[in-house]
Amino acid sequence: MGKIRKLDDQLSNLIAAGEVVERPASVVKELVENSIDANSTSIEIHLEEAGLSKIRIIDNGDGIAEEDCIVAFERHATSKIKDENDLFRIRTLGFRGEALPSIASVSELELITSTGDAPGTHLIIKGGDIIKQEKTASRKGTDITVQNLFFNTPARLKYMKTIHTELGNITDIVYRIAMSHPEVSLKLFHNEKKLLHTSGNGDVRQVLASIYSIQVAKKLVPIEAESLDFTIKGYVTLPEVTRASRNYMSTIVNGRYVRNFVLMKAIQQGYHTLLPVGRYPIGFLSIEMDPMLVDVNVHPAKLEVRFSKEQELLKLIEETLQAAFKKIQLIPDAGVTTKKKEKDESVQEQFQFEHAKPKEPSMPEIVLPTGMDEKQEEPLAVKQPAQLWQPPKQEWQPPQSLVREEQSWQPSTKPIMEEPIREEKSWNSNDEDFELEELEEEVQEIEEIEMNGNDLPPLYPIGQMHGTYIFAQNDKGLYMIDQHAAQERINYEYFRDKVGRVAQEVQELLVPYRIDLSLTEFLRVEEQLEELKKVGLFLEQFGHQSFIVRSHPTWFPKGQETEIIDEMMEQVVKLKKVDIKKLREEAAIMMSCKASIKANQYLTNDQIFALLEELRTTTNPYTCPHGRPILVHHSTYELEKMFKRVM
């Protein structure tokens, strides 16, 4: 007798459930997507104990006909496709016919559904076995309840996380579905407490405000572009609003939320040098394309996709974001934090756009620290970053009481999705309608971010603090400038241009610089000699495991030539495959940092003025190459509010 046997349907469904139904969030995703495919405009999601005890989905969709109810719970039974050609024209969220039988095989499931043209159907299934089927009175739509999930697979139940974690996974899925389908009204309840309600009016920004808060919605930049193959729309936050994780970026392809690393990477590249390392924007990007260009049949969970014109899509995303940011003045508002009776007022103040009445600009008097003679020094040579001005011996020192620890700048925002579960009072329809109307009004009142160019306005210096920060003003208010970050941006653009072409002029070294490497490092560098020439580094083999450098480009920072060479070599050794674009970028960033003014370095009037004027000529005068802000703005209105001149 043969050893190979065909598995029965119940066992097959249990095996399939291992891929399709990983946790309660998977059940919610599959059932809500089915409701959307059924043309629902309103969907309610009711949970008990994060879905482990009970999940109930109620929609007003097309419903299921009586003769289809049993078939719907058979493996690979679907109304979405008929033949193999339909696989390449998929517009629906579901199509595999695996979700319902998989869910039913590991739970106690109850279904009440009606198409509206005939009596409804009531179906009860336990562990894949049909317990009850009868006709019933029902409105049009579907009401499906899943209880005691994984009751017959204790091993799977054992690996469920805490209720808080599982609920967080569900809210994350529901949030992304709400973003991808703003035309559908979604209500999410946990233990009879409302967590989310979207109006279903089609306004994505209102959905984003419901999820992330109205303060974040005020900082959203609209994104829109079109090519022959792709149409992209969405919103991304200004660089000042960031999070510590990529989870706040949502990518939607033909109405389907997908997890795609290269799409997220393209969004990050669109913020090139605008974000600090380890910080990520909040973003929502909807991509429409011919279904022939995307394969959604990669994994049963349908979260992974593959594109046939991936590079063209990535380029379109990067260029669209970069073009949008070039139209905006990216100066973060410092904001005013004062205690308010309303709990959200203080947070709102930090994000609020303030519009002070413009006044006639005037050139202020320059106030400099004692002991500095501006006539003795030449203006700072920012175009040739080599010789930096040194403060005189009798330099001004701030009082010790004013010295404070350096802190890296972070936007003053409360993380929204890091604590996604907002327990509220028991649901009340009147309160809920009022909240939605109030939110809708607030979203409508949001003023669009001005996209009239990103030129830095003229700034008139006032003075310097701690030899680190420059104070300047104009008719819009007060500006605080980080002098190191400012010159770092200037130097970066200078070096980025230089390192992008082979040096015509080189400086011969009096004594050739020798670089000793391990055998593995030597072989790796040897493979990249031609690539290194493209960034101005010419190496000659010297002995068994060594190279020598006889010259370097004249634009290498003076006194730091060998250090620059060592760090460039380290980059080559560290990378398995040298990306010349990345190598140039890293080299330019490294040299710009080393050649820039440091903290506690006092400048003359002419040097400050030259630095600010040079900053205005850069393509991005708002962040240093590492993504840190160069300047922060206090509007005149905010200052008047601080001093209670306005209430």
UniProtKB/Swiss-Prot annotation:
Molecular functions (GO terms): ATP binding; ATP hydrolysis activity; ATP-dependent DNA damage sensor activity; mismatched DNA binding
GO terms under biological process: mismatch repair
Alphabetical list of InterPro entries matching this protein: DNA_mismatch_repair_CS, DNA_mismatch_repair_MutL, DNA_mismatch_S5_2-like, HATPase_C_sf, MutL/Mlh/PMS, MutL/Mlh/Pms-like, MutL_C, MutL_C_dimsub
Pfam families: DNA_mis_repair, HATPase_c_3, MutL_C
Annotated CDD domains: HATPase_MutL-MLH-PMS-like (cd16926), MutL_Trans (cd00782)
Keywords from the named record: DNA damage, DNA repair
UniProt GO cellular component terms: mismatch repair complex
Record PROSITE patterns: DNA_MISMATCH_REPAIR_1
Keyword Repeat annotated: no
Function: This protein is involved in the repair of mismatches in DNA. It is required for dam-dependent methyl-directed DNA mismatch repair. May act as a 'molecular matchmaker', a protein that promotes the formation of a stable complex between two or more DNA-binding proteins in an ATP-dependent manner without itself being part of a final effector complex.
Listed NCBIfam families: mutl (TIGR00585), PRK00095.1-3 (NF000950)
Homology family: Belongs to the DNA mismatch repair MutL/HexB family.
Name under which the protein is recorded: DNA mismatch repair protein MutL
Species, as recorded: Bacillus cereus (strain ZK / E33L)
